């Protein structure tokens, strides 16, 4: 049993059998210890002759696990004059040989490095006995990207190009948002799920309601489609509580929130603000509409305070008024998901007898894959689509 940095491990799987031919780096056994499991690879090629361990047994470093018959090796020694090499070549061979000897990485890490096109010799291991961990690969990849960005920023366009370019200063808001977006994109494994929902009935009701209020001269405030989406999302968060959570990376725990506050992104002269509607699940459509209008106006006049922009559980990014079909919104940490809304379009849909025109709204759901799996996300966005297509589900 090789030294993998753990005092004792349990055998949970034996991957080979007696008389089986094995190759270097082929997995022999799978062990588990200290809340992690890994494959132990073969250092040689040969044939398995005896297996000394069994599943469930606990073993320590240097324990005998298998006996193998090593394939024949050609020990033919060439003549003295044939093996005289330049000192520089010998030094290079010796250097690489030493690297191979003291190289510490599990097969999983080796495969991951190959997939990421990372040379493990360039990675500094921070695990026990300098073992290379997944976090070391993440750090190495992050440093590479930062170096590329630095090099890109150093591009010199030359004197002939200077008259054809113009530099613009980023506003303080753009700088802060840019830093947050970069950090969230680098640290959160994003997955984006897409769906399309029929809002024909909902839009007819919305227009009818606004026309009646306008004719009665009770209000000049129109209820937007966004208000209905916010209310439905709050309902979905109650049904799918993992979406209303945060991930505590330090102690590896998910923090579920007992309140539902929903932020909505708003663009003001290329500056992005995310006001937060509080306790959405406890308010009706008219209350939410009034608060949405108030916060939107405060954003446009740049009068939002800290209370208006903190405490969010989930964010909605609405680009429907601008255009576009789909996009991948970036999660607003410490939240674990964000819903993107695009421009609705009339499309043909089949009602079982014929094609009819339907108003279809594109939805884009990005979520943190460390917390939420694909099936759970699919159920969440499907639930939102079903309720938006028939608001009667809100009273169920």
From Swiss-Prot:
Top EC group: transferase
Domain Peripheral subunit-binding (PSBD): 104-141
SS bond partners: none
GO molecular function list: dihydrolipoyllysine-residue acetyltransferase activity; lipoic acid binding
Transmembrane spans: none
Domain of life: Bacteria
Cofactor: (R)-lipoate
Residues covered by the Lipoyl-binding domain: 1-69
Cofactor binding, note field: Binds 1 lipoyl cofactor covalently.
InterPro entries: 2-oxoA_DH_lipoyl-BS, 2-oxoacid_DH_actylTfrase, 2-oxoacid_DH_E2_comp, Biotin_lipoyl, CAT-like_dom_sf, E3-bd_dom_sf, PSBD, Single_hybrid_motif
Catalyzed reaction equations: N(6)-[(R)-dihydrolipoyl]-L-lysyl-[protein] + acetyl-CoA = N(6)-[(R)-S(8)-acetyldihydrolipoyl]-L-lysyl-[protein] + CoA
GO biological process: pyruvate decarboxylation to acetyl-CoA
Catalytic site positions: 369
Pfam families: 2-oxoacid_dh, Biotin_lipoyl, E3_binding
GO cellular component, one term: cytoplasm
Described function: The pyruvate dehydrogenase complex catalyzes the overall conversion of pyruvate to acetyl-CoA and CO(2). It contains multiple copies of three enzymatic components: pyruvate dehydrogenase (E1), dihydrolipoamide acetyltransferase (E2) and lipoamide dehydrogenase (E3).
Subunit structure: Forms a 24-polypeptide structural core with octahedral symmetry.
Protein's recorded name: Dihydrolipoyllysine-residue acetyltransferase component of pyruvate dehydrogenase complex
């Amino acid at each position: 049993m090789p030294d993998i940095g753990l005092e004792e491990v349990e055998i949970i799987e034996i991957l080979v059998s007696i008389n089986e031919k094995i190759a270097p780096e082929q997995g022999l056994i799978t062990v588990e210890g200290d809340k992690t499991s890994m494959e132990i690879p073969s250092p040689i090629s040969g044939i398995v002759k005896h297996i000394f361990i069994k599943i469930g047994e606990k073993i320590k470093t240097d324990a005998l696990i298998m006996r193998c018959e090593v394939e024949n090796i050609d020990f033919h020694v060439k003549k003295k004059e044939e093996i005289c090499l330049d000192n520089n070549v010998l030094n290079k061979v010796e250097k690489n040989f030493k690297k191979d000897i003291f190289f510490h990485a599990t097969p999983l890490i080796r495969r991951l490095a190959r997939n990421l096109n990372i040379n493990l010799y360039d990675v500094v291991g921070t695990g026990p006995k300098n073992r290379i961990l997944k976090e070391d690969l993440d750090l190495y990849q992050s440093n590479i990207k930062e170096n590329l960005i630095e090099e890109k920023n150093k591009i010199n366009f030359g004197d002939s190009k200077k008259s054809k370019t113009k530099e613009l200063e980023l506003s303080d808001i753009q700088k802060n948002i840019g830093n947050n977006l970069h950090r969230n994109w680098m640290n959160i494994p994003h997955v984006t799920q897409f769906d399309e929902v029929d809002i024909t009935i909902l839009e007819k009701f919305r227009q009818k309601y606004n026309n009646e209020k306008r004719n009665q001269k009770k209000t000049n405030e129109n209820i937007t489609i966004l208000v209905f989406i916010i209310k439905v999302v709050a309902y979905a968060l109650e049904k799918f509580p993992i979406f209303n959570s945060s991930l505590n990376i330090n102690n590896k725990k998910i923090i579920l929130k007992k309140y539902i506050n929903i932020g909505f992104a708003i663009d003001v002269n290329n500056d992005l603000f995310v006001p937060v509607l509080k306790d959405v699940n406890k308010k009706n459509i008219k209350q939410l509409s009034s608060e949405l209008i108030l916060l939107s106006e405060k954003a446009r006049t740049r009068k939002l305070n800290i209370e208006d922009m903190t405490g969010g559980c989930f964010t909605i990014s609405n680009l429907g008024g601008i255009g576009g079909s789909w996009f991948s919104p970036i999660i607003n940490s410490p939240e674990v998901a964000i819903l993107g809304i695009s421009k609705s379009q009339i499309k043909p849909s089949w009602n079982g007898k014929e094609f009819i025109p339907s108003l279809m709204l594109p939805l884009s759901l990005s979520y943190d894959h460390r917390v939420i799996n694909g099936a759970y996300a699919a159920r969440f966005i499907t639930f939102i689509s079903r309720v938006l297509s028939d608001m009667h589900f809100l009273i169920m």
